[in-house]
Amino acid sequence: MKLTKKLLAMALAGVMLLTILTGCSSGKSGDRLVEEYLATFFSENSGDVPITHDVPEIKAVAENFDPSLLASNGIGFDAKVIHNPTGSASDNLQKLKSALVNYKNCTNVYLYAMAVPEGLSELTQVTLLLYYSSYYTAYTNTTGGLPTLDSIKCASTLVKKGGKQYRLVVLIQVPAAS
């Protein structure tokens, strides 16, 4: 009986892993899958900080996103552009920042972006965004050290511009009330 339970548990774990790796998860949208993968990553790295997905401003971010801000490989923001913006790049970054102004008093407000080739799984997108891309810091308030976090807000969307797809992720670290 114990052997049967172990075999069934292993089979279930295998099916769940296959579901995650292939991106087939009971009809969940790609946006929600990306958010869940990020939530898993941040919950493992941030302790018991609750993670929510309520960032309605992601729509305004998507409307104001300009692909010219991306690095030449399409993964993450161009570090030269975000650290020394001029001309239209400066205007485009200001539009993104303005879309997230409701969170200006949060600990950190990050924006991740990348071009998404057809067929790239959500898990691969998250891996590339977290480990191989430069993010844009719209706001940061960490003077005096990193405060205790009340929650982390995370939202994702896939936007089409100029015939290409782009994954946008907003990550907001909300400080605990003092």
Locations of regions flagged by a protein language model:
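Bacterial N-terminal signal peptides that target proteins for export
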Residues: 1-11
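N-terminal low-complexity, intrinsically disordered segments
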Residues: 2, 24-26
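Aromatic-enriched hydrophobic runs in primary sequence
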Residues: 7, 25, 70-74, 96, ...
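C-terminal motif of bacterial Sec signal peptides marking the signal peptidase cleavage site
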Residues: 19-23
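Short, well-ordered surface patches within globular domains
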Residues: 26-92
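A well-ordered secondary-structure block
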Residues: 82-178
